Amino acid sequence: GVPVYHSKNLVNWELTGYCLDRRSQLELEDCRNSGGIYAPTIRYHKGMFYMITTNVTDKGNFVVHTEDINSEWSEPAWIDQGGIDPSLFFDDDDKCYYCSTGIIDGVRGIVAFEINPLTGVILSEKKLISEGCGGQCPEGPHIYKKDGWYYLMIAEGGTEYAHRETIQRSYNVYGPYEACPDNPVISHKEYKKSEIQATGHADLLEDENGNWWLVFLGIRRFSHALLHNLGRETFLAPVKWENGWPVVGYNGNGTIELVMDAPLPGLDCEESSANIRIDKQSGQPILYADHSVDIDFTDELLDKRLQYTRNPDTSKYI
């Protein structure tokens, strides 16, 4: 459960292992369809990797950690907080804050509090920091800090065609938060002819060159009707900052395209040079993701890219 991939250019990714590789970490007995693990988030702080997520089939929200991302992860540290889509934020003073969906005094929204990420112990009062920016189902929260501002980014509108991503900011981690005047920062809700739809549930990152990116979910429709057969996929889009707010893509309207021009990192590495092709329409070199799969079934052990539905039952192996 929860595969970990590594990349030098944000386009070509190699599977390196799994955060959850044993039943003591991941109990999936009697797991229903669309059950199990929801929305994992990975963070790194002072030599430690953290992965926080929800097992909706078991005991809810938990965090695991490791100093070596290519080795085993810890046993789960369970967190006494309901809701889904948890995330961690480490402030300048090393305090760690948890945020997820939740309910405080009957009000549903985004809940935050200080936490010990190694043990899951809650260290402060739980507070409702946002009810969203007007869309239904505010979820998938992430907190960032940039230039003295705390930014709270959340998904809204549900996970179908009204999906979108909004952002707010405050000088205090607990708010009050003011909404970006140009929200949503990404959405294809009003662009039904776009090949990409249902964009949202995003995370921001800054690369080694100081360039910003948005990684998010979306779907690719395959006909004039809003139909798709691959489900929600992972997308990447360039981000620039204007007037203290992130602007996604280059269209100025919160939409992206399947092919975009952006300064990717690591273009001089071997993984990049092996996957650069000339675009037939523009004649320009484009870095493509390599989706090819080559598995040798003569090996004694199964390839780590193969997964078993729910907890493995070795009695069914041949």
Q: For the regions a protein language model found, what residue spans apply to each?
A:
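Carbohydrate-active catalytic/glycan-binding domains of CAZyme proteins
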Residues: 1-318
